[in-house]
Amino acid sequence: MKTFSYRSVSALILTALLATMPAKAETLKNLLQQNLTGAPEVKEALADVEAARNRTEQSKSAHFPTVSVTGSKSLSQYHQDKNDYTSKKIIPGVQAEMNLYAFGAIEKDVERSRKEEEYYRHTHAATREELGYTIGQLYLTALNMRESIAVMERSLARHQRILQDLAVVLENDEGRESEFVQAETRMLMVQQEINTYQQKLAATLNTLSKYHHKKIAANTLSDPFAQLSADELYHKYSLTDKARNPLYQAGAADLEARNLSLQAEEKKRLPRVNLVGSATREDRQIGVQVAWDVFDRASDYTVRERASAIAAGHERLLRTARDLEESATLAKINIQESQAQLKTLKRQIAASEKVVDFYRLQFDVARRSLLDVLNAEKELSNAELAYSNTQHNLRQSKLDYLYTQGMISAWSGIKNQEIKLNFK
């Protein structure tokens, strides 16, 4: 019995220790490292790269001969000379064709395919940045909701203390019941705000959990940029050349591919010189074939289509450059403004706390009304909530800046590596 008792006590102590142990922090960097290499979106982008590689090989294959096996059988024939009649048996044979000269059409098509492959490589990098930005936004939103709940819970605790004091007064003075009801109404309003934040937190965590192998708890979230100052952000994660952003690089590669596609289409309208040959059991022949589409209405419109696509790609690239530059500048402005606001709000919170304490003391000696105390409490809660939201804006602005520089992957510790895949 003693042994059983000791074991039971040990088990209870171990259970209590495990229950009181802090939950393992789930950092934003950990989430990004898990997803930016293995998420379905990233794997899809990698598959597109592999598909582009295969299309490049398809274009190169135009330089190689095409060999086919044939079988022919005459169903009906008429010749004036009886010696021209051939057998009605199935005649097996081989045909081959190889391009000798195409005025650079094949080479341009290969260049276009290679440029499209480059486009998909940059799109893969841009997809990682986009996914990292989405996960980062969800993470920061969940963190903001948790901090807002903490602010409102402190406000709720202060309202509960006011109610406790009023309950004691009410026992001796029933005429002050209206004050009790007024304070209780304010407390219920705070509770409702907490419920709203909790609902938003649960929804955000639920969405965030799809990027993790298990459900993420709110108490495991932490500030991902707590140790990253604005100066360090600009020094370590700024592009020396704005054109190196993967989103811009993808647009530039796409524009070059469109230009090469137009050039290839124009060269396809020129003559093609092919070496052709065939062989059967009875006959063998080889020769040179020149093909030139002197009239092809569809080709004219294809060239026009390619030209229009180039114009669209050029404007899209300009818009991408403009948007990235604007977003980077706006992120810097928001970082600077948020830092200034945090300093002011910190002083405002300290002053509001003193006002609440003073009003509580003055209310106790009937020099302030309960409404004054409740309003002061509301101002304190608003200041604390504004501080929490401004912290969120600062973090979001840092994430925005990383995105405009294409540096989310680099910040999370993921290096750009050579893509080596072969999907079967």
Positions of predicted regions on the chain:
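Bacterial N-terminal signal peptides that target proteins for export
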Residues: 2-10
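Periplasmic alpha-helical coiled-coil/stalk elements that build and connect Gram-negative outer-membrane
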Residues: 2-3, 26, 30, 127-244, ...
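Acidic, low-complexity, intrinsically disordered peripheral segments
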Residues: 2-3, 24, 216, 388-424
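Bacterial N-terminal signal peptides
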Residues: 10-19
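Bacterial Sec-pathway N-terminal export signals of envelope proteins
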Residues: 23-68, 174-177, 209-259, 321, ...
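A glycine-/polar-enriched beta->alpha junction
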Residues: 33-43, 50-66, 94-112, 122-129, ...
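Amphipathic alpha-helical coiled-coil segments
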Residues: 44-59, 127, 131-154, 161, ...
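Small/polar, glycine/serine/threonine/aspartate-rich low-complexity segments that form flexible
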Residues: 70-100, 109, 221-232, 267, ...
